[in-house]
């Protein structure tokens, strides 16, 4: 899959995240922020920046609600080794805060065709496990290119979650109002990039997109994040692995005035089948495949077939599923 990347994309990813890429080739070390010293770049038909946020997903020193869906809470940082704090992940062992949960970077991007005078949207993208913004979200998964190629008028914001780790922790998105605080800062920083669009960004509806382990911050953003009235769309890419009740509750309630698309491979088929059955039992109509337009009330499930989960974002139908989905969204 790496062979598909354009030379321009690879170079831009290196420019934005050189320190991180070098860290991936070395042994364990303290995580450096991808936003350190990063300015504006032109990447794949979009203007891109990596900015440090106060309301980033991490660092996070709070509790994990509904730990492993048991209804119980526990401290997120539950390991202290001579003052070095860490989180014991049920799948990935111990992840140290200084390596995995200290990067405040957030990807900001808008197509070069972006026009603040026209209707637009803000896309919030939650990446999956074992990912960084520069190496994976920009370069490998081509999220920026897919947005630019779709023709959708809007801005993209993607917070760094657990850095290059097998962990889906939501961090501050677990907190009540965490999503609203993040969104408020995001629209302000997008306004810094496009001063003439400050007012437009404050009014734009929001589309949440989650791939794989990004389901966890997405679920809590919908359930307790605040500003749910601005969320006019939810896109899950092979992501229904847990917290199904939160997605169902949203689709039955606030989501009635939004659209909901869940595309899946065999990896998350069981979760999708379960959510779809619950929604239909509650009287929420669903459709197979993508309709021509994604309008309020659309609930679509897309079976992508035998696609490798790790390559889903660039291999599902046509090789650019987000480009296809974004192209069906009205501003």
Residue ranges and their predicted role:
Residues 228-239:
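A conserved short beta-strand
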Residues 25-121, 154, 287-288:
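A domain-start/cap signature at the N-terminus of enzymes
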Residues 262-273, 280-331:
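C-terminal catalytic histidine-bearing segment of alpha/beta-hydrolase fold enzymes
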Residues 119-122, 126-189:
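Active-site machinery of serine-nucleophile hydrolases
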Residues 199-212:
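Alpha/beta-hydrolase fold nucleophile elbow
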Residues 182-202:
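Conserved acidic catalytic loop of the alpha/beta-hydrolase fold
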Residues 215-226:
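Short glycine-enriched nucleophile-adjacent loop
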Residues 13-23:
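Bacterial N-terminal signal peptides
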């Amino acid at each position: 899959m790496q062979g598909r990347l354009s030379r321009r994309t690879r170079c831009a990813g290196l420019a934005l995240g050189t320190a991180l890429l070098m860290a991936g080739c070395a042994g364990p070390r303290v995580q450096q922020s991808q936003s350190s010293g990063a300015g504006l770049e032109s990447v794949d038909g979009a203007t891109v920046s990596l900015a440090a946020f106060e309301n980033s997903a991490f660092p996070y020193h709070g509790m994990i609600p509904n730990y492993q869906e048991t209804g119980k809470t526990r401290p997120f940082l539950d390991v202290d080794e001579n003052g070095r704090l860490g989180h014991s992940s049920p799948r990935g062992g111990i992840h140290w805060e200084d390596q995995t949960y200290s990067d405040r970077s957030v990807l900001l991007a808008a197509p070069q065709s972006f026009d603040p005078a026209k209707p637009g949207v803000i896309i919030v993208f939650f990446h999956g496990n074992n990912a960084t913004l520069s190496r994976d979200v920009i370069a490998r998964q081509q999220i920026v290119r897919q947005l630019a190629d779709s023709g959708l008028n809007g801005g993209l914001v993607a917070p760094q979650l657990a850095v290059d780790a097998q962990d889906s922790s939501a961090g501050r998105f677990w907190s009540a109002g965490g999503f609203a605080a993040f969104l408020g800062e995001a629209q302000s920083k997008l306004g810094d990039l496009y001063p003439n669009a400050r007012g437009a960004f404050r009014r734009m509806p929001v589309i949440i997109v989650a791939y794989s382990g990004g389901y966890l911050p997405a679920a809590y953003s919908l359930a307790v994040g605040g500003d749910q009235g601005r969320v006019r769309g939810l896109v899950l890419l092979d992501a229904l692995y847990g917290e199904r009740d939160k997605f169902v509750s949203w689709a039955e309630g606030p989501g009635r005035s939004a659209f909901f698309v869940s595309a899946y491979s065999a990896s998350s088929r069981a979760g999708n089948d379960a959510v779809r059955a619950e929604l239909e039992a509650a009287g929420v109509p669903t459709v197979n495949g993508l309709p021509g337009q994604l309008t309020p009330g659309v609930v679509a499930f897309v079976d992508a077939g035998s696609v490798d989960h790790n390559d889903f974002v660039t291999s599902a139908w046509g090789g650019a599923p987000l480009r296809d989905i974004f192209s069906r969204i009205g501003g």
